[in-house]
Curated annotation (Swiss-Prot):
Naturally occurring in which organism (per UniProt): Burkholderia ambifaria (strain ATCC BAA-244 / DSM 16087 / CCUG 44356 / LMG 19182 / AMMD) (Burkholderia cepacia (strain AMMD))
Principal place of residence: cytoplasm
A GO term, aspect molecular function: CMP kinase activity
Name of this chain's protein: Cytidylate kinase
Binding-site residues, ATP: G17, P18, T19, A20, S21, G22, K23, G24, T25
Length: 228
C-alpha cells in the first residue's frame, strides 16, 4: 500500500478515472458495502444546472447560482441522483442540462461553491467519492485513493452496452473515437488535468468484473487497518 495515513475519524475513499472506466459503479458498491455516503462529482454539476433551470436562475446570475448551490438538497445512491428527494438521474443527462452545466461552471465563484459542496459530503461514518480530481484536488487527504484505468476499447464496449440497455442506439466506433478525444482533452487541460494522485493505487479494470474491482478496493482499504 502507498498510503501510510493514520485512521481518520471520517475516512474518505476517492475513486478517479476516465469516462466509462467503471468508477461510478465501483464507488457505489464500495460505499454500499461500507455503509458510507456517496458522492458522484460529475452529476453534482449537472444537478446544479438542472436546479438553476427549474428555479429560473440565469446562467449569468452568479450570486443567485452560488446561493442555490449552497441550499441544494442532493443525495446519491447506487445509480440514482436525487434532487429535493426526487430521482432526476435521467433528467440530468439531457443535452440542455449539460450545456447549462458548462455555462455556469465558467464562473469562479460558482466553481468554488461546487467544490465546497463536494467537500461537505464528508460525513460520518465515511465517504466514497468518484470523479476526475477527487484524490488530487477535492480530497487530497483521503485515506485511500484509487485511480481506475481501462483500455479505450474496453471502455467503449461498456458504454455501448450501457446505452443499448437503456434503449439508445450507438455506434461503437464513434464511441471509441469520442472516448479517445475526451481522454486527450482531460489529460492535457491546464486546470486539474486527469491524472492519478502520486499516492494513488492504480487499478486496471479492462479484464476485471465489477465484483473483482470492488473486492480489490476493499482489500486495499482493509490493508490500511480500516474496518471493512
Amino acid at each position: 500500500m502507498k498510503s501510510t495515513r493514520p485512521f481518520h475519524p471520517t475516512p474518505v475513499i476517492t475513486i478517479d478515472g476516465p469516462t466509462a472506466s467503471g468508477k461510478g459503479t465501483v464507488a457505489a458498491l464500495v460505499a454500499a458495502h461500507l455503509g458510507f455516503h456517496l458522492l458522484d462529482s460529475g452529476a453534482l454539476y449537472r444537478l446544479a444546472a438542472l436546479a438553476s433551470v427549474r428555479y429560473g436562475i440565469a446562467a449569468e446570475d452568479i450570486d443567485a447560482l452560488v446561493k442555490l448551490i449552497d441550499d441544494l438538497h442532493i443525495t446519491f445512491r447506487e445509480g440514482c441522483a436525487q434532487l429535493d428527494g426526487v430521482d432526476v438521474s435521467n433528467d440530468i443527462r439531457a443535452e440542455a442540462v449539460g450545456n447549462r452545466a458548462s455555462a455556469i461552471a465558467v464562473h469562479g465563484p460558482v466553481r468554488s461553491a461546487l467544490v465546497a459542496r463536494q467537500r461537505a459530503f464528508r460525513k460520518t461514518p465515511g465517504l466514497v467519492a468518484d470523479g476526475r480530481d477527487m484524490g488530487t484536488v477535492i480530497f487530497p487527504d483521503a485515506v485511500l485513493k484509487v485511480f481506475l484505468t481501462a483500455s479505450a476499447e474496453a471502455r467503449a464496449a461498456r458504454r455501448h452496452k450501457q446505452l443499448m440497455q437503456k434503449g439508445f442506439s450507438a455506434n461503437i466506433d464513434d464511441l471509441l473515437r469520442d472516448l479517445r478525444e475526451r481522454d486527450a482533452r482531460d489529460s492535457n487541460r491546464a486546470a486539474a488535468p486527469l491524472k492519478p494522485a502520486a499516492d494513488a493505487e492504480l487499478l486496471d479494470t479492462s479484464a476485471l468484473s465489477v465484483d473483482e474491482a470492488v473486492d480489490q478496493v476493499l482489500q486495499w482499504y482493509r490493508a490500511l487497518g480500516q474496518p471493512a
